[in-house]
Amino acid sequence: MARIKRFLEYPTGFIIDNTSKRVLPIIIPTGSLSLDRLLGGGIRTGLVTDIYGQSGAGKSQLCFSLCVNCAKYLKQNEMIMFIDTVGTFRPERVSEIARQDTNSKILDKILYIRAFSTIEQIKAIKKIPEINPLLIVIDTATSLFSYEYRGVARHLALMKHLHELSFAAINFDCAIVITNMIRSVPLIRTLTTQHDSNTTTNSYQQREFMGTSVSIYSHMKLRLEIVNSEKSIIRANLMHPIRRSHADFRIISRGFSDQFIQ
């Protein structure tokens, strides 16, 4: 109990100025019309959006597109914060997506932070009051915690971090997007046959890594999966709020497209 109490009792370190809060949230388009319709317009400020899926499903690409589109809504004293824990950030890809836009200095508006430990990842969040970001991206949120912690301590440390993120999203009116991995979980099923009623078979189910802990502090959850790898067609499934709806889109050089090649 003492160990659990140590993880749960901590200061947020944020000073809140409620006078600066917006009357209405800002909705950041994703770059895909079908995905925007699924999300009710796009990614909203004041919410933590969890985007998870297998490797190559477009999680980082979606984050890059959000950075480009978010730049259109930035005020003079606002920025975009991109916290990279696995080395996925590609400035040349962000510039490629923004090439069609009149805003050619998109990279100047992105504060890039390469975190090599959970301490660095957590410290980056403390910079929110001075940076005043409109969008915060953490790609990926759970990776460093999986390396440094084990068992219950891993979940408690992650939930502590996510609680601060949720607190920041609500009180600083910023959109927070985190990405996450999936893992295969073995399922054991019992089959009843004429000769043996205890026959078991092993199968696997894909689940979000540390999904239970992440879900507690996520306001929206989006699962990405590959529909057609050759044509770069991705399916986005809205998992929370529970609608069980989906939208398909393609990854192209300028970002996303809703037109499919038959």
Where are these regions (language model features)?
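A hydrophobic alpha-helical transmembrane-helix feature that marks the membrane cores
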Residues: 43-46, 62-63, 67, 120-127, ...
